[in-house]
Amino acid sequence: MPPFSHVPVLADAVLDAARRIPRPDGLLIDATLGGGGHSALLLEQHPGLRLIGLDQDATARAAAAERLASFGDRVSIVATNFADYVPPEPAVMVLADLGVSSPQLDVAERGFSFRLDGPLDMRMNAGGEGETAAELIDRLEENELADLIYGYGEERLSRRIARRIKADLKDRGSYDGTAALAYAVAGCYPPKSRRGRIHPATRTFQALRIAVNDELGVLDRLLQQAPDWLEPDGLLGIISFHSLEDRRVKTAFLRDERLQRITRKPVVATEQEEEANPRTRSAKWRVAQRLAAA
């Protein structure tokens, strides 16, 4: 398995926002620690900060522990999903990067990739509890699968794709892996549409991953809980990667009486960052501040 070397996206925007933290010696909660890239930069920028990093992925935690080892006892790593967490004290900043990390996408065994053949898994807690993507598509009726692909993937060909998937399952019993599913989805597109920058299976795989991990439900719980994790004037910053997430973040920051928006519009990657790391092209960064009187 290749090393967990995730490149933090929108790093300059995150560091710029962190200049607003109410005090330099407070607690930073990285709710999606990953390889620790964002946290390492923030700890370097603010030598008095302490970090609690949350991640349910054992590979990510191990990589983060190695990357953050030089910060010693300023760092604590917790094996948990951020939706289940209660912090020991108020934080000056809560950060969440909602994207699937490059190492997760690039390891076939995780089952996230439509470019690399692997088992149809897609669980963030690899090998843990919960339904796999293969089990999900086998369980759902055709119309339910179509609704899921449309609702979570915003896929206009969802009916055709669901019909093809269920027909394949009837004929073969199950898919051999991610490559077979990706091939089936691509076959639902006209030939001209298969040669674009975005792979035809992108939206379907996104929908399955969101459903398997209850990503939107988990995000809703974070948006409800995280403001209470903050001390007055503390920051809540979230990086989202698709419109379903970004709409939720935008709406929460607008309506939550505990928060005041810092970013009126989302910060996106520069052309230079997109060229260096193409996965940043859909990233959006929004920041809000905890109101002192809320």
Curated annotation (Swiss-Prot):
Entries under Gene3D superfamilies matching the protein: Putative methyltransferase TM0872, insert domain, Vaccinia Virus protein VP39
UniProt-listed Pfam families: Methyltransf_5
Reaction catalyzed: cytidine(1402) in 16S rRNA + S-adenosyl-L-methionine = N(4)-methylcytidine(1402) in 16S rRNA + S-adenosyl-L-homocysteine + H(+)
GO biological process, any: rRNA base methylation
Record bears the keyword S-adenosyl-L-methionine: yes
Subcellular location, record wording: Cytoplasm
Superkingdom, taxonomy of origin: Bacteria
GO MF, any single term: rRNA (cytosine-N4-)-methyltransferase activity
Family to which this protein belongs: Belongs to the methyltransferase superfamily. RsmH family.
Protein name: Ribosomal RNA small subunit methyltransferase H
Species of the source: Synechococcus sp. (strain CC9605)
Lineage of the species this protein comes from: Bacteria, Bacillati, Cyanobacteriota, Cyanophyceae, Synechococcales
UniProt gene name: rsmH
